[in-house]
Amino acid sequence: MSPRSASVNEELRRRSRERLLQAAVELVSERGYDATTLGDIADRAGSARGLVSYYFPGKRQLLQSAVHRLMHRTLEEALEREPRSEDGRERMARVIDAILRLARDQPVLMRQHMAGLLQAEGFVQCPEQVRLSELLGDTVARYGSQQVSADYPMLRALLMGAVYAALVPGVPMKVPVLRAELFKRYRLDWEMGVPPDAEASDGPRETDLSRFFATDPEPEAGPSRQPGRGDAERGVPPGPDTGLARGKHERASGPGGQRRA
């Protein structure tokens, strides 16, 4: 029986991880963080329960990676939306609107994410977080910053503060008010990005997030092996010659060669 190639094994592992990320986002959004167990996430993903701990140290780290994925893919989608723009101010407006919309549409996820960042262990350095930092750093650079290493953390802090203010139980601030302050800070025109009046603020919230996770059908096995779940799906760790596939940004640095939160 001929073994699968290393590239096929890596693709299977990548998709297994994608399913876990998607399952974490779905379940925490539906049930809340405390009511969601790692076993629940594994079951929703169709994976062996032991596989979760192979990819992630714990539930908090898994959720942070999942929300960072949701955030960076949301930003990518906003920046690539037609008509595409290379204008730095328009791109900054789209980033601000995308993050504020996440706070509006996914309050349970974003509130738990903010709470997790304040834990003693701090944020999780993962491929999804690195990609998010790269997008924000690139946005700051295209906006015209001459000091990205200083202006990137400020943008991050302002966005986090806006999300926090929008989600404080009992006394949340309105998204248009927060948007106005951020737009004033960056000297953006109200018509840029996606103004609140362009989509009803009390309209339906987006709930289908599956497009942000690459969970396509697994590649077919070779002719001498019956198709089925991969070794990774059964909880079998990779062999010495086929280590876990890493995202291309996992060991990368953000703009300016510095790792970012």
PLM segments and residue spans:
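Residues at secondary-structure transition points
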Residues: S7-R15, P57, Q61, S65, ...
